[in-house]
Amino acid sequence: MWFDGGMRPRFFVYGAVVCVLALAGCSTVPPVIPIFGRPARIRDEGYSLLYSLADKQSNVGKILIIKKASAKVSAEIKEIAEVFGKAKERLDGFAKEDNGLSFKMSDLPSMEEKTRAAIESTTTKDLLFSSGKAFELRLLLTQVQALDYASHLANELADKEGNPKRKEFLTQFAKQCEEHHKTVVEMVGGG
């Protein structure tokens, strides 16, 4: 009989091992990115971030429909929106040319996404409920951050980009962002 002394402990041990293995299989483990797919995934994550930024920044000038700013600030904001609008169009073109290129891969941690959404909401409220010089300063400060981030992101993407056409675009876009960044910083400083 298997209930006699020898089989019972062994049956218990086997059962315990099966339970441990089953429970261990239930834990969530982040997916492992295959080595051959990792560069494309990193590239797509970068392009996703750049595309999202270009989409938002291409609309930055719309705030001037409901808020007043000086002619100098308004002109700069409209130029920035145009630069990002053209970048978004180019990115759309690249995606059409290469269906392997995806702009839907931000994969930011949940806390990062929530933090960014909270910052965006607060910034929008601050802009909408300010006026005059305070509004202009807040608006320009948002552009200092966006342009700095965009130029660095585009440069990082350009360093990793194997496609010469996209690499050239990213390099030029980064330079445009750097130029506008300098202009906006001067405007913030009273220049």
PLM feature segments, named:
Residues 26-191:
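His/Met- and acidic-residue-enriched segments that coordinate or traffic transition-metal cofactors
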